[in-house]
Amino acid sequence: MTNSKKSSNNSSKSSELYAIAETSGQQFWFEVDRYYDIDRLNAKEKDKITLEKVLLLKDKDSISVGKPYVKDAKIELEVVSHKRDKKILVYKMRPKKKTRRKMGHRQELTRVMVKSITIGKSAPKSSSKKETVKKETKPKSEKSTN
């Protein structure tokens, strides 16, 4: 009896690089060259948008988990179009009363295409200087016994 192990090289190309990012109060799993419908963004078509709230980033063999965000990670998106979602009907009624209310809602959406997922230094360190403040300690006062 022979032991044959199946190789794990049959994984798809899309699982090599992905990121989980936060936008519009939701978390999305972003992959390069895919499009996503997110809540309406204030941008025109063909505009470039950069998401910096990256929660997790996986690149081939390494996984970076943010606390809460991954440092210097960016996702670059391109706005493809603006559209509206399907209509949702809401019907309210009170039984045994003549109160009925039928309302509808269509969510405004923006379709975006993921152009790139990068991690690296975005700004030089000189722009984000931290000032060091020295604490002055008071000497302990000696109690005199008179």
Swiss-Prot record:
What residue spans carry the region label Disordered? 117-146
BP-aspect Gene Ontology terms: translation
Signal peptide bounds: none
GO MF annotations in UniProt: rRNA binding; structural constituent of ribosome
Would you tell me the protein name for this molecule? Large ribosomal subunit protein bL21
Family assignment? Belongs to the bacterial ribosomal protein bL21 family.
The alphabetical list of record keywords is: Ribonucleoprotein, Ribosomal protein, RNA-binding, rRNA-binding
Task: Spell out the NCBIfam families in the cross-references.
Answer: L21 (TIGR00061)
Q: SUPFAM superfamilies in the record, alphabetically?
A: L21p-like
The Basic and acidic residues compositionally biased stretches are 128-146
Q: Quaternary structure? A: Part of the 50S ribosomal subunit. Contacts protein L20.
**Protein's job:** This protein binds to 23S rRNA in the presence of protein L20.
Q: Which Pfam families match?
A: Ribosomal_L21p
InterPro entries cross-referenced by the UniProt entry: bL21-like (IPR028909), bL21-like_sf (IPR036164), Ribosomal_bL21 (IPR001787), Ribosomal_bL21_CS (IPR018258)
Q: Which GO terms describe its cellular component?
A: cytoplasm; ribonucleoprotein complex; ribosome
Where does this protein come from, organism-wise? Answer: Prochlorococcus marinus (strain MIT 9301)
